[in-house]
Design a protein with these regions (language model features):
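Right-handed beta-helix
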Residues: 1-2
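PLP-dependent amino-acid enzyme catalytic core
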Residues: 17-266, 270
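Hydrophobic alpha-helical segments, chiefly the membrane-spanning helices
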Residues: 277-281
């Protein structure tokens, strides 16, 4: 893909910056990856989103979506479906905002993840054997209870919240040639690429997918969103069958390319990362 000036891309609203005030999210550091740089002979930097209170970037988008709701919607509470990071992001944001929170998690979710979400005060419902089944259950409950469903990636406010990462990257003194972002449903890639594209043409943006879960690559091939028949589950955090609609609209305009990779094909850079990063990174 060739990056063009975005026609209509989400801008992190002034509300997005409020995530720092309530400490739902923090401005994370960018660290020089010494071992990985030596391994591949290129300077590599890591955006340390593992240092967030919920150990991932998901709290940014979740909070930005939730604060966009009306007072009446907030009073009723929200519901989300997730087996991990999104669940924690929504639950933590709701705790800070004192909003009722209901999370639907697949029955296969490890107990440790269920407990971590409960610790933020969310009510848990175990339903379905997969993420998609949990989503269907959550949407049904949302309709019955007339409460807002917080989508993990396919939402303009969520996308804009994730885009604050791009804002932080450009605030540093370092000049970067390219930014590489993992792709699941596309929320992170859409948000960061939108911000970068609006503020500079010097930095290339690439999405990175595992080959057996490459829903974005397939969408680009056919110039429309494609639902994968099956996805690999080793990298379960990015195992998504179909790229988000709002996400794909932004990505087509703002991203320079997509890279797919095989698991363990080149273990050395991975080993170099693991030797310097905590397991949650």
């Amino acid at each position: 893909m060739i990056r063009r000036p975005p026609r209509s891309t989400p801008k992190p609203s002034s509300a997005a910056s409020d995530v720092y005030k309530r400490q739902v999210s923090i401005k994370t550091p960018i660290t020089f990856a010494t071992n990985m740089t030596a391994k591949i002979n290129n300077e590599v930097y890591l955006k340390r989103e593992d240092l967030q209170p919920v150990f991932s970037f998901k709290s940014r988008g979740a909070y930005n979506k939730i604060i966009s709701l009306t007072p009446a919607q907030k009073k009723k509470g929200v519901i989300a479906a997730s087996a991990g990071n999104h669940a924690q992001g929504v639950a933590f944001a709701c705790k800070k905002l004192k909003i009722p929170c209901l999370i639907v998690m697949p029955v296969t979710t490890p107990d440790i993840k269920v407990r971590s979400v409960k610790n933020f005060g969310a009510k848990i419902i175990l339903e379905g054997d997969s993420f998609n089944q949990a989503v269907k259950a959550a949407l049904k409950i949302a309709k019955t209870k007339k409460i807002e469903f917080i989508h993990p990636f396919d939402d303009q406010y969520t996308i804009a919240g994730q885009g604050t990462i791009g804002q932080e990257i450009l605030e540093t003194d370092e000049e970067y040639d390219a930014i590489f972002l993992p792709v699941g449903g596309g929320g992170l890639l859409a948000g960061v690429s939108a911000w970068i594209a609006q503020h500079t043409k010097k930095v290339k943006i690439y999405g990175v997918e595992v080959e057996d879960s490459a829903c974005l690559l397939e969408a680009i091939k056919f110039d429309k969103r494609v639902r994968l028949r099956e996805v690999g589950l080793f990298a379960d955090g990015v195992a998504v069958e179909q790229i988000g609609k709002n996400n794909f609209d932004v990505i087509k305009e703002c991203v320079d390319g997509v890279i797919t990779c095989l698991l363990y094909t080149s273990p050395s850079p991975r080993d170099a990362t693991l030797s310097r990063m905590p397991s949650s990174a």
